[in-house]
């Protein structure tokens, strides 16, 4: 059964070791990068919730949820950042290890992430956004099938 677990000292290295196919490396940051980013924003107006994705006791992927408070944007010059991120949640990262793709784990993990977001850990919000590389058709179709809609905003090249 698919479930999420917080990243901690007992599972960090097995999550860092998960990899995507070479052809997918440009679609998602390495898990260690995401974990460092989560650590780096812990004292800012951004919240990060990094999770390991497990199938029973086997680690199969990584997911990170973000939340950006309005204070983050008050003096921010990044004109490329979508305004829909203000006071809203985001599915910041999602990766399934190359050995476990095409088994429905990504879909189930997103559903669990949305359940977590509905607990409002940083307060209520209007949206949950995400971004993906335009070339990543598999991600686009997965997100659409779960009810996500494109709104025309971009986050850099995503």
Locate the predicted segments by residue.
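Active-site acidic-Proline motif in GNAT/NAT acetyltransferases
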Residues: 97-103, 134-135
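Non-catalytic interaction surface on structured domains
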Residues: 87, 124-127, 143, 147-149
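Conserved active-site alpha-helix within GNAT-family acetyltransferase domains
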Residues: 107, 134-152
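Acetyl-CoA-dependent GNAT
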Residues: 2-99, 110-112, 116-122, 155
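Conserved beta-strand-loop-alpha-helix junction that forms the acyl-donor binding cleft
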Residues: 124-140, 156-158
């Amino acid at each position: 059964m698919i479930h999420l677990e917080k990243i901690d000292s007992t599972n960090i290295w097995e999550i860092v070791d998960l990899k995507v196919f070479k052809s997918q490396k440009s679609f998602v940051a390495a898990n260690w990068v995401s974990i460092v980013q989560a650590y780096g924003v812990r004292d800012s107006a951004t919240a990060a919730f990094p999770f390991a994705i497990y199938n029973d006791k086997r680690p199969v992927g990584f997911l990170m949820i973000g939340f950006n408070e309005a204070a983050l944007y008050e003096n921010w010059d990044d004109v490329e950042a979508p305004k829909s991120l203000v006071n809203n949640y985001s599915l910041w990262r999602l990766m399934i290890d190359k050995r476990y793709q095409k088994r429905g784990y990504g879909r189930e993990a997103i559903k669990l992430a949305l359940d977590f977001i509905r607990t409002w850990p940083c307060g209520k919000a209007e949206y949950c956004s995400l971004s993906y590389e335009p070339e990543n058709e598999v991600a686009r179709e997965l997100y659409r099938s779960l009810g996500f809609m494109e709104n025309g905003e971009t986050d850099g090249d995503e």
